[in-house]
Amino acid sequence: MSLRDDLTINERDPLLSSFDQRQEYNTSNNTYKVNNNSNEPSVLTLYNSDELGTSQRSSYQKFVRRSQEFKMQHREFLAEFIGTLILVLLTCGFCAEQTLNIEKSKSWLTSSLGSGLSVLIGICVAGHVSGGHLNPAITIAFWVFSGFPIRKVPMYITAQLLGAFSGAALLYSIVEPAISQFDHGKRQILGELGTAGIFGTYPPLYVGTGSAVASEVVGTAMLLLVVMVTGHPNNLPFRTAQGAMIALGVTTISLCIGYTSGFSLNPARDFGPRLFTAVAGWGIDVFTVHHYYALVPMFAPILGGLAGGFIYTVFID
């Protein structure tokens, strides 16, 4: 989308008006700059102001026009990317606070509240543009049960994965000194000095794979129920506050059954940060530890999302 043709240059951007506010210094379209330093000879600098101003205006207009066109062509991708980046940055930030807290006053309540608030802020950022999926499980369930265009599915999931990876990288750039202070510069996945859990989700060692899968499937199914129910056109009391209701749902699910799996419900939220840790010093073992547990948050939420969408479509809608 191009800029409106009926706007003048100064109306489009007040910054450009500065080119037109120097006329009092111009004589016959030429501008003279005089060095008034009494200790040095006067120096006259001559340049054609109209040519310079026109060139800069033209370059700036082209940049703005191309930026606007790029944004309009990819606005849903950008919204999902930025929304997921914020979600992961804040969610993992809460995990970092819990892991690196020298007081050792860890609380699952704090982690659960952090997850819910992070989802709320991510939806606030992206919801009005892309719908605020921020989760491949939601995107796939919407495609299967709600008529979401299949051509957009790969684009949404790609944006979510890239946003999650970027959010983890941004957080690492902030908390890296604290991590190095905590683990003495030796990156560990699990154990007392393990820090990979800041980014990826890891269940307690005593939890079996079956229990973790059940937690992710049931939790994501309930999340999809909340998303679809609060988004129904006839559910006005909750539709107007859908973002807050989804955030409350995430917090509640986390408090009730999230601890057994490390709580993901979102393949992008786990895979993006896990991939980052693999290249940032923790090594490829982040994908193989705990009997290849990385496969659970990668695929179980998708199954849960489909189950939740099926239950809503068949029994509720």
Swiss-Prot record:
Induction: Expression is relatively low at the spore resting stage and increases steadily from the induction of germination to a peak after 180 minutes, at the onset of the polar growth stage. It is found in: Cell membrane. The lineage of its organism: Eukaryota, Fungi, Fungi incertae sedis, Mucoromycota, Mucoromycotina. Residues 1-75, 130-154, 230-242, 317 are cytoplasmic. This is Aquaporin-2. Pfam families: MIP. It comes from Rhizopus delemar (strain RA 99-880 / ATCC MYA-4621 / FGSC 9543 / NRRL 43880). It is a multi-pass membrane protein. Keywords: Cell membrane, Membrane, Repeat, Transmembrane, Transmembrane helix, Transport. Aquaporins contain two tandem repeats each containing three membrane-spanning domains and a pore-forming loop with the signature motif Asn-Pro-Ala (NPA). GO terms for molecular function: glycerol channel activity; water channel activity. One of its GO terms (cellular component) is plasma membrane. NCBIfam families: MIP. Water channel required to facilitate the transport of water across membranes. Contributes to water uptake of spores during the early stages of spore germination. Aquaporins AQP1 and AQP2 act as extracellular pH sensors and enable the spores to hydrate under favorable conditions and to commence germination. Wounded vegetables and fruit present acidic pH, so the optimal pH range for germination is adapted to the relevant host pH. SUPFAM superfamilies: Aquaporin-like. PANTHER family: AQUAPORIN OR AQUAGLYCEROPORIN RELATED, AQUAPORIN-9.
